[in-house]
């Protein structure tokens, strides 16, 4: 079971995204919460949604955003979808797992800068 936080306008005005609802819905309903995006600039809203805990992103796709239709302007073309997935995967790596550790890449600096105080 997963709820989707959504705005019904096509395209959605960015200032109406109210992404802070994601953690609120997660806490209130004790379930996964995703984001259903209808904005014309996907990464401006989908990336912060992931950072706030969205566990899925729902987007409309089209082969051409200039085609006639209510949701074409708010849809992603294939290249836009590829970029969005790439960026979300990078953000997931950047956010990490929340466990503090010393990374292998830190060891040389640690050896160089660490001093023993007596």
Report each predicted region and the residues it spans.
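Catalytic cores and adjacent flexible loops of soluble metabolic enzymes
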Residues: 1-118
């Amino acid at each position: 079971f997963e709820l989707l936080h959504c705005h019904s306008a096509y395209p959605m005005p960015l200032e109406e995204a109210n992404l802070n609802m994601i953690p609120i819905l997660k806490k209130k309903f004790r379930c996964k919460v995703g984001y259903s995006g209808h904005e014309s600039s996907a990464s401006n809203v989908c990336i912060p949604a992931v950072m706030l805990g969205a566990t899925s992103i729902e987007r409309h796709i089209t082969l051409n955003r200039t085609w006639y239709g209510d949701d074409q302007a708010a849809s992603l073309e294939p290249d836009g979808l590829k970029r969005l997935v790439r960026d979300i995967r990078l953000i997931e790596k950047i956010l990490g797992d929340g466990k503090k550790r010393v990374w292998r890449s830190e060891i040389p600096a640690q050896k160089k800068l660490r001093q023993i105080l007596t």
